[in-house]
Each structure stands twice: as C-alpha cells, then as structure tokens.
C-alpha cells in the first residue's frame, strides 16, 4: 500500500484568475517613445510569479490594498499611495496577504543603467515639505525625484482642490508623461497650440492620458478633490523646480 497522500484536484473555471497584469499603454499605442504603463490586480492570499523587465526600469504605485514586494532579498510593504522603484533587469514578486484585492499601477521606461530600489512612504512623504510643492489650489508630491537615482523615470501625485485648474499651462521639449487619475472627476486638455485644441476629455477614476513631448496638458477639477499620478520619462526634473515662473504663475504658458 502506497504511503503517498492523494490530494484532491482543483477546478479552475474559465474566468477564474488570481493575479493579472493589464497592459494599458505601450509606446506603439500611445504616441510616446519611452514610457508605458499597466496595472497589477492581486487577489487576497496570492503571490505573483517572478516579474522581470529586462530592458526597463519601473515604478510601482499602490492604489488599493496592501502588498509585500520582494526584490533583491529585501521585502517592502506598500499600502495606499506608497511607491517602489524597481531597477533595470531586477526580478521581483508581489504578495497580497490582506483580505482586500490589491491594485498597483506600474510605469516603465527603457533604461541602460542599474540602480538601487527606492521605497517612498505616502504617510511620510505627504508630510515632508521637502517633497511637496504648493501651488494655487493644488499640491504636488514628489515620490521619485531627482534626489533618487534612475535613468529616465520620475513620479509622484498631484491633488487638486475642487474647482481648480492647471496654471500656467506648460509643455516639455525633453519629457513625456502619463497622468493616471486615482480619485475624483475632472477634465483634461492636451494640445500643441490653441488652434488645434481638439483633445478635450472628461476623466474619472483610473482613466489615464498620455502626453507626448511639446503638448500642453492642463487639468481641471470639478466639485470634488481630484487626485492623479504623474509619471515622467526623459530628462529628470520637475517643471516648477526648473522654471520658477511656474510656481509664481507669471505667464500664461511656458516651455521647459
């Protein structure tokens, strides 16, 4: 008589899933040249397969739930709005040990150099004035800034108070971006000049807009707070730190 224990089978229905990556935009589908993004959905009690981006660096941004990310023999715990920079060609896994389904945004850009992981805590950074830029009716939070080493990526959050608009409108010669809206409802325009302003859309939770170089890209909030991720690929600077006129609102438009 065999001593091997016989285990029961498992039925996996056609629509069952435990961990999934949703590709939201690639360069070929978004008119960008460096930047792509997607989302990870992780059910309770699930650990992902090993993940690896062989020619890209990445940043994870936790939108819902709480997860453990294992990278380079370290474990980082991410909860609401925490972020983690994943260096070029660095394996990692994501584990959801909580009862709630987790949602992470992942932004990626091609890279040549390999740096260290960098974890940023929303609880800490949202109170650290060195990480905050205060503008009229809105605050910008720098979660992955120039103080951290990366090839192309920078990222953070912007929170608009109700009935606020971007001012001044600005564009970039050396950066492309994606905005991913995480709370509230608003609107966004993207245009090269006023005469060709045809991209005007309402936005709500988890909508996103890609911003190729030289496009102005103002955002407008409505009757509630509007939160969004901004992720940059290209030259590493934040517009208000490079051009102080942006902070002062001295011009209607500016270019960096």
Residue ranges and their predicted role:
Residues 41-42, 52-69, 109, 159-161, ...:
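Short, conserved beta-strand element in jelly-roll/cupin
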Residues 1-34, 49, 101, 107-156, ...:
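A short, N-terminal "cap"/entry segment at the start of jelly-roll beta-barrel domains
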Residues 85, 99-116, 158, 210, ...:
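A short hydrophobic beta-strand segment most commonly corresponding to one strand
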Residues 72-88, 193-214:
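Short acidic-glycine-tyrosine-enriched beta hairpin
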Residues 234-256:
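Non-heme Fe(II)/2-oxoglutarate
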Residues 20-26, 36-54, 157-175:
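Conserved short histidine dyad/triad with adjacent acidic residue
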Residues 48-50, 69-70, 78, 86, ...:
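Short beta-strand His + acidic residue motifs that chelate non-heme Fe in jelly-roll/DSBH
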